[in-house]
Regions:
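N-terminal Rossmann NAD(P)H-binding glycine-rich loop of SDR-like oxidoreductase domains
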Residues: 5-28
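Conserved Rossmann-fold cofactor-binding substructure of NAD(P)-dependent oxidoreductases
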Residues: 62-92
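Short, conserved SAM-binding/catalytic segment
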Residues: 49-57
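ADP-ribose/adenylate-binding Rossmann-like module
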Residues: 88, 99-117
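Rossmann-fold NAD(P)-binding glycine/threonine-rich loop
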Residues: 111-133
Length: 176
């Protein structure tokens, strides 16, 4: 099946989804070099997003339910990448990751749920590799503190020992 869309923003009517829509509109317009669409479960809310950002009827709207694998497959077969803001991901993201991995569609989210990420990697990494799907978790604020910690650690390892670490393990602990 031809993947006519470059990106589908799933969860476009939520707060973070609207930020993504605004960015894509400002950077690429609705008929620019990037072919993108908005998706969610409520057509009325998606229409309101189009009106809020003065997006015309040419911008495709995809109605999809996060627990309906058939509708997710239709979406993931039509695009190269799904950027999802629909969380919590452990409740609403598992079937989407499965669909992307199976259909060779890239997946991007901004989760901060490490246990769920581990489950998804364990369940879908082999199929994603075989299909060419790239699964990218935590692409946003939730990952920044850990990324900065790794950067600081590697910088100090290089300074003190003359080399960086090949492997760094982290853990998430309750913050009271």
């Amino acid at each position: 099946m031809s993947k006519d869309l470059d990106i589908v923003v799933f969860g476009a009517s939520g707060y973070t989804g609207k930020l993504v829509v605004e960015y894509l509109k400002n950077e690429y317009g609705e008929n620019g070099s990037l072919k993108w669409a908005i998706a969610g479960r409520d057509e009325t809310k998606l229409t309101a997003v189009k009106e809020e950002f003065s997006l015309g009827n040419d911008l495709e709207t995809v109605i999809v339910e996060s627990d309906d694998l058939d509708s997710l497959d239709l979406m993931t077969n039509a695009t190269k990448c799904v950027l999802t803001t629909v969380g919590p991901y452990q409740l609403y993201g598992s079937k989407l990751v499965e669909s992307c991995a199976r259909n060779g569609t890239d997946y991007v989210d901004l989760t901060g749920e490490p246990g769920w990420m581990y489950e998804m990697i364990s369940a879908h990494s082999k199929e994603a590799k075989e299909s060419g799907s790239r699964i990218v978790f935590s692409c946003g604020f939730d990952s920044i503190p850990f990324d900065l910690g790794v950067y600081f650690l590697q910088k100090n390892m290089q300074k003190k020992y003359g080399k960086t670490s090949n492997k760094i393990r982290g853990r998430v602990k309750a913050m009271n």
